[in-house]
C-alpha cells in the first residue's frame, strides 16, 4: 500500500519514549540478562528499521516473525543478533546463514525436511521452541526435543538457545502461568545439557513475574508504552506511550435537523449542528466498529457520527472550526486523552492489535 504523505493523517512516533521504556525495564531486570527487542509486525506498527536503529545500542538483539522482517533489518544496517520466532520454510535456510539470522526449530518433522534438503548447514544457528502450554508451535516432550538437539549438533548446527512462550502472563490469575513455567523447567531439567541462552519472559513476564526471568527476555508491546494486560493489571512503574495518531479537519458544514450522514444513513441529526470530515478511514486501520467513539478536537471529545468509510470519517463538532484544525485519534489534546487501550476496549480487542492495524498508508513521522 502506498504511503499517503500528502494527507494530514499521520502516526507520530516518539522514539525517545521507546528508549525510555527500555531503560525502565532494564533498571528492574537483572543486569546480566540479555534484553531482546521484539520488532515484528513493523515494530508493532511503529516502524521496524527506525525503532531498531534508535535502540540498537541498548538491546542485545531483535526478535521478528519471519525471514522478510529479518532481512529488512539487515538491509537497514542492523547487525546485532536477530531471532525469527516463527517456523521458517526450509528454502530460507541459506538466506538465514548468509545474513546471520537465527531460526527457530519447533518439530522433528521440520528437522526431517531440513535433513532431506541436503542444504549446507555450516553457520546455521537455531533456538528450539518448547510448547509448554501455548498450543501453537514447539516440542511438547523431552524425548523429541533431545533428539532434535542431538541431530542438529551432529549436523554441525549451532544450538544457541531454547525458549517457550507464556499464554497468560498478563492475567490476574497466575495458575496457568505457573503450570507452563513448571512444564518448561521440568523439560529443561531432563535435557542432557542446556544451550547458552534460555528465555521464556515476554513483556508481561518481565513486568509481573520477574522472579522467573532466566538469562534472556523478549520485550515487545511494553517497549512501545502499551500495557500487555490492557487495564487488567497495573504497571509497576512508569511507561510512556510512543505512538499518536493525528489528522486535521478537511471539511466542515452545518446541517439541519433531519439530515442524514454517511453510508446507510445510520446517523440523522436531531438538531442543527456542525459536521466535520477527517481524511482517515478503515483502510488506514480505523475500523468501522469505531462509530460512536470519540476523537479529540480543541481539547474536547467529539463523537464519530455516521459509518466510517474507507478513507474518511465524520464527527459532530461543538462549534464551527476552521479547516486544518488538528484532530487526535490516539494521544492528547488539552486535558483530554485517548489511549490505544481505550480504542481496544471499544473494539473488544487488545491495544497492540490497534497499533498493528494502522496501515502503511499512514506515514510514520519520527520524533528524536
Curated annotation (Swiss-Prot):
Extract the signal peptide range.
Answer: none
Report the EC number(s), separated by commas if there are several. 5.1.1.1
Q: CDD domains from the xrefs?
A: PLPDE_III_AR
Q: Name one Pfam family in it.
A: Ala_racemase_N
GO CC terms for this protein?
cytosol
Q: Which keywords does this chain's UniProt record carry?
A: Isomerase, Pyridoxal phosphate
Q: In which pathway does it act?
A: Amino-acid biosynthesis; D-alanine biosynthesis; D-alanine from L-alanine: step 1/1
Catalytic activity reported: L-alanine = D-alanine
N6-(pyridoxal phosphate)lysine sites (modified residues): 40
- Where along the chain is the active site annotated? 40 (proton acceptor), 263 (proton acceptor)
Query: Is Isomerase given among the entry's keywords?
Result: yes
Gene Ontology terms, MF aspect: alanine racemase activity; pyridoxal phosphate binding
Name the domain of life this protein comes from. Bacteria
Per the UniProt entry, what are the Gene Ontology biological process annotations, in alphabetical order? D-alanine biosynthetic process; peptidoglycan biosynthetic process
Q: Which residues bind substrate?
A: 136, 310
Q: Which family does it belong to?
A: Belongs to the alanine racemase family.
Q: What does this protein do?
A: Catalyzes the interconversion of L-alanine and D-alanine. May also act on other amino acids.
* Protein name per its UniProtKB record: Alanine racemase
Amino acid at each position: 500500500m502506498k504511503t499517503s504523505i500528502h494527507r494530514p493523517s499521520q502516526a507520530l512516533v516518539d522514539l525517545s519514549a521507546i528508549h525510555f521504556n527500555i531503560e525502565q525495564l532494564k533498571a528492574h531486570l537483572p543486569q546480566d540478562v540479555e534484553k531482546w527487542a521484539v520488532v515484528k509486525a513493523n515494530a508493532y506498527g511503529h516502524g521496524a528499521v527506525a525503532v531498531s536503529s534508535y535502540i540498537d545500542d541498548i538491546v542485545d538483539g531483535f526478535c521478528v516473525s519471519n525471514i522478510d522482517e529479518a532481512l529488512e533489518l539487515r538491509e537497514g544496517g542492523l547487525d546485532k543478533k536477530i531471532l525469527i520466532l516463527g517456523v521458517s520454510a526450509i528454502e530460507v535456510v541459506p538466506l538465514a546463514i548468509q545474513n546471520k539470522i537465527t531460526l527457530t526449530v519447533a518439530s522433528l518433522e521440520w528437522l526431517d525436511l531440513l535433513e532431506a534438503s541436503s542444504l549446507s548447514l555450516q553457520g546455521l544457528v537455531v533456538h528450539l521452541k518448547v510448547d509448554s502450554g501455548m498450543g501453537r508451535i514447539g516440542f511438547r516432550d523431552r524425548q523429541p526435543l533431545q533428539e532434535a538437539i542431538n541431530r542438529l549438533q551432529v549436523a554441525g548446527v549451532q544450538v544457541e538457545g531454547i525458549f517457550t512462550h507464556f499464554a497468560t502472563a498478563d492475567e490476574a490469575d497466575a495458575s496457568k502461568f505457573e503450570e507452563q513455567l513448571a512444564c518448561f523447567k521440568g523439560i529443561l531439567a531432563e535435557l542432557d545439557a542446556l544451550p547458552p541462552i534460555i528465555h521464556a519472559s515476554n513483556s508481561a513476564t518481565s513486568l509481573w513475574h520477574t522472579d522467573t526471568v532466566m538469562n534472556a527476555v523478549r520485550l515487545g508491546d511494553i517497549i512501545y508504552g502499551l500495557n500487555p494486560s490492557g487495564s487488567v493489571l497495573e504497571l509497576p512503574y512508569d511507561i510512556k506511550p510512543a505512538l499518536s495518531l493525528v489528522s486535521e479537519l478537511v471539511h466542515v458544514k452545518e446541517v439541519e435537523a433531519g439530515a442524514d450522514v454517511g453510508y446507510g444513513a445510520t446517523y440523522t441529526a436531531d438538531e442543527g449542528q456542525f459536521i466535520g470530515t477527517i481524511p482517515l478511514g478503515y483502510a488506514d486501520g480505523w475500523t468501522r466498529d469505531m462509530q460512536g467513539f470519540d476523537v479529540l478536537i480543541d481539547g474536547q471529545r467529539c463523537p464519530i457520527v455516521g459509518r466510517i468509510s474507507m478513507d474518511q470519517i465524520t464527527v459532530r463538532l461543538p462549534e464551527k472550526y476552521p479547516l486544518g484544525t488538528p484532530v487526535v485519534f490516539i494521544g492528547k489534546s488539552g486535558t483530554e486523552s485517548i489511549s490505544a487501550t481505550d480504542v481496544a476496549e471499544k473494539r473488544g480487542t487488545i491495544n497492540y492489535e490497534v497499533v498493528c492495524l494502522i496501515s502503511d498508508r499512514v506515514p510514520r513521522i519520527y520524533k528524536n
